[in-house]
Amino acid sequence: MKTHKNHLRLLILLLLVLLACVGYMTVGVHFENQKLFAYAMRIRTPKLIAMLITAFAIGSASIVFQSTINNTIVTPCLLGMDQLYSLIHTAVFFVAGSGSFLAVNANAAFAVDLAIMGAVATMIYSYLFRKTNHNVLYVLLIGTVLTSFFSSIQTTLTRVMDPNEYDTLLTDLVASFSNVNSAILVLSVAVLALVAFAFRKELVLLDVLTLGKDQAINLGVDYDRCIRRLLLGVTLYIATATAMVGPLAFLGLIIANLSRQFLRTYRHSQLITGSVLFGMIVLIGGQLLVERVFVYSVPVSVFITVGGGVYFLYLLLTQRKA
């Protein structure tokens, strides 16, 4: 009975996503003018696809991350990918300037971001995970320390950077769907699909892993290997989304917990689907608000950060009372 209710709830979320997509693609469009209509579709379609891909990457990664860590108020930003992204772009502007190839070529910047973040993720969750005897808390601590380390270096570089370069850099450090490259979208989908295929065996074991280490091992699961590979997959998903549109730190926390509270189930297939759908609603609705109400004066990441901070405090207070 509960499964049927959740299927109905997911269907409602899907309808809301479709409504948000239709609203985003049609609001403010001049249908009577074919040229303006074609121009609007050409501009909005890549943005919409980017929001759908980002919601899929962050939504699915956040649920997997929380289940792996066994904590529902943590977010994948603890892995340090957001700060590493900021450091990479700051270093490029500091060393080569805003007119350099990496600064102006979106495809090259995406490839470099993904390569560096992927290399760091592989080092942490392959080498250091073994060195810490597969201790998840140690790995999270390493991620937190690296986040502070990357942030400190980035702050130091911005303090001695040319003010004009820093002003240009700020547009890169804020998550934006305004200038999305179609080639990047194709590459992002390919990367996400390859990661999902590579870790498909671990994904189907999520329901078992949440029972705890001892129970999972008794059921024949190679627990340490599964956790290591899932954390690597989460990091690659977050790295892909961040390299594509920029850092969205609190989005994962919001949509993952909305999915858990709305569906109230331990089935990860439903939780991940719900998280992805909530992510699409938040991003598309937020971008529609940015474009039509605030006329691009405030980026969507600001609303997500403010809303995520308030929601995080709410989660802390409710869990403390419980």
Regions found by a protein language model. Name each.
Residues M1-A322:
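Alpha-helical transmembrane segments in inner-membrane proteins
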